[in-house]
Amino acid sequence: MNKQDFYFDLPSELIAQYPLANRSDSRLLIYNRQTEEYGHYQFREIADFLQPGDLLVMNDSKVIPARLYGHKATGGKVELLVERITGDFTFLAHIKASKSLKSNDLIYLDAGKRLEVLQRQDDLFLCKASENILDLLNDLGHIPLPPYIDREDESLDKERYQTVYAKCAGSVAAPTAGLHFDEAVLSSIRARGVNIAYITLHVGAGTFRPVRCERIQDHKMHSEWFTVSPDLCTAVKAAKSMGNRVIAVGTTALRSLESAAMGGELIPCSRDTDIFIYPGYQFKVCDGLITNFHLPESTLVMLVSAFIGHQECMALYQEAIDKRYRFFSYGDASLLL
């Protein structure tokens, strides 16, 4: 298939620039793959469409304030986006500067803090901080809003560009399907008899990388670290053995589950994945997916197309556009069953 097969015309005013006042105020477009029927609801109603015994798998990765601003010894401005923390003091980052940095260069930050460039690794730079990197980011870092949110980060983003169940620090972009869940929705889901389990996948900046190849099969996915625990494997197998559904909350949860089942059976693991899911992929674990509405020609639209069918995906997205759904990270959600 070609990249253009996944194009749709999205009015710019449908790209959500801010979250709604309440997380569960988001709209919810529900699609049933068997009946090909869909309906329009509010996200707070989602428990009504889940069944006792269903297993929701959520990504508990926590967004770090990964964007830093500093300057070189010459005074030239430097902007960093931390891609991956590799140790207490070391990390890989994207760096923007007027002139490319080299090994041993220093980057000066506020409050007398500084970073040292150790070496270049392809498009990234391995750097070392003058103190624990997580502490430094929490002091000076900015929330790394996606490129399609056309504004600077604000104080509200520290809370709202984060799921209420985020626990494991490491993502530079939010697992956005989880942003709609508040404590009331989680309580209603549990009261319904639905089980919840967690995976961790640290979302990298590569999630926003466009597909540049004409043939989508030629696209090389970015790599992200994930972990699937023995407890999660047990929960998935228990659900499957009872004939219950495993529903991924977000494409990151789905990609983690499918990556851990590449051999046909879900196994515990902690490693990198660059799995690329597009039409023709045979799903091994996931029976349902909760996800936002994604960019035209993106790998995430290709994943949704693989899950519900290409024509069905394009028709569903056109329905969302016609009904003025809000798109992307701070936008509305879909439940695909």
From Swiss-Prot:
What keywords are assigned to this protein?
A: Cytoplasm, Queuosine biosynthesis, S-adenosyl-L-methionine, Transferase
InterPro entries, A to Z = QueA, QueA_dom1, QueA_dom2, QueA_sf
Protein's pathway: tRNA modification; tRNA-queuosine biosynthesis
Can you provide one Gene Ontology molecular function annotated for this UniProt record? S-adenosylmethionine:tRNA ribosyltransferase-isomerase activity
Catalytic activity as recorded in UniProt: 7-aminomethyl-7-carbaguanosine(34) in tRNA + S-adenosyl-L-methionine = epoxyqueuosine(34) in tRNA + adenine + L-methionine + 2 H(+)
Name the GO terms of the biological process aspect.
queuosine biosynthetic process; tRNA wobble guanine modification
* One Pfam assignment: Queuosine_synth
User: Briefly, what is this protein's role?
Assistant: Transfers and isomerizes the ribose moiety from AdoMet to the 7-aminomethyl group of 7-deazaguanine (preQ1-tRNA) to give epoxyqueuosine (oQ-tRNA).
Name the NCBIfam families on file: PRK00147.1, queA
Recorded family membership = Belongs to the QueA family.
Q: What is this protein called?
A: S-adenosylmethionine:tRNA ribosyltransferase-isomerase
Q: Which gene encodes it?
A: queA
